């Protein structure tokens, strides 16, 4: 997989230019999205382009999240206090990590968008709430670009579809990353849809980290 498009707000650019912990977070996320390969015996990511909507997207997300959890110690399903305690509505952040060096703390929340455009707007708004209320210091959304999304599950949103609304994040440290396959080939196997063909694994949930302190 490869990163093909990015939108980085000025606030995020400033943090990236001077903050080592934010740089580390950004590099870990980019490494994770570039890590998936397909087929499994390959060294690159090639997607089957036989017809529209012929591949699944969840296995791609899980390959990315496996690296974030197992190698970089990110956690899944981090609730925002503003949603859980005050508004009592809304789901947790997909993946979250606290970067600590000496007495400095940076909290990063990320969403890997596999839903439709409405889902993407919810993800963006959720992360904006986290930034506004001081619960995270950097927000990141990963999503396929339009070319790749055409061959993924029906109605999966894409970078270009959400792009007209990126300006809503200006004034906040926010990064959007659009990824693409390295090659297209009708002869490679289809990526299973949903969780089909995926081995079950135990995910690292934030609540388990908190409860085990």
Swiss-Prot record:
Question: A GO molecular-function term, please?
Answer: DNA binding
| Top-rank taxon, per record | Bacteria
Name the active site residues. 113
EC number in record: 3.1.21.4
Identify the residues that bind Mg(2+) 2: 77, 94
For this protein, what reaction is catalysed?
Answer: Endonucleolytic cleavage of DNA to give specific double-stranded fragments with terminal 5'-phosphates
What keywords were assigned to this record? Endonuclease, Hydrolase, Magnesium, Metal-binding, Nuclease, Restriction system
**Gene Ontology BP terms:** DNA restriction-modification system
According to its UniProt record, which cofactors does this protein need?
Mg(2+)
What's the record's note on cofactor binding?
Answer: Binds 2 magnesium ions per subunit.
**Which Pfam families does the annotation name?**
BamHI
Residues that bind Mg(2+) 1: 94, 111-112
Query: InterPro entries from the xrefs?
Result: BamHI/BglII/BstY (IPR011338), Restrct_endonuc-II-like (IPR011335), Restrct_endonuc_II_BamHI (IPR004194)
Q: Tell me the subunit arrangement.
A: Homodimer.
Q: What else is known?
A: The protein sequnce was determined following expression in E.coli.
The name of this protein is Type II restriction enzyme BamHI
Q: Which organism is this entry from?
A: Bacillus amyloliquefaciens
């Amino acid at each position: 997989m490869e990163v093909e498009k990015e939108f980085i707000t000025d606030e995020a650019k400033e943090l990236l230019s001077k903050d080592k912990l934010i740089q580390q977070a950004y590099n870990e996320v980019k490494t994770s999205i570039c890590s998936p390969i397909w087929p499994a015996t390959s060294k690159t990511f090639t997607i089957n382009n036989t017809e529209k909507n012929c591949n699944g997207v969840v296995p791609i997300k899980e390959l990315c999240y496996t690296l974030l959890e197992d190698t970089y110690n990110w956690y899944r399903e981090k609730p925002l206090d503003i949603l859980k305690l005050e508004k009592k509505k809304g789901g947790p952040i997909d993946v979250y990590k606290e970067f600590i060096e000496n007495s400095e703390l940076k909290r990063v929340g990320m969403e890997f968008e596999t839903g439709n455009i409405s889902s993407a707007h919810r993800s963006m708004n959720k992360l904006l709430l986290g930034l506004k209320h001081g619960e995270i210091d950097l927000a990141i959304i990963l999503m396929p670009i339009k070319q790749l999304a055409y061959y993924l599950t029906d109605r999966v949103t894409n970078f270009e579809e959400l792009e007209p609304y990126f300006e809503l994040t200006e004034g906040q440290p926010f990064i959007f990353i659009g990824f693409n396959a390295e090659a297209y080939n009708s002869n490679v196997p289809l990526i299973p849809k949903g969780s089909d063909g995926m081995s079950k694994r135990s995910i690292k949930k934030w609540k388990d980290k908190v409860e085990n302190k």
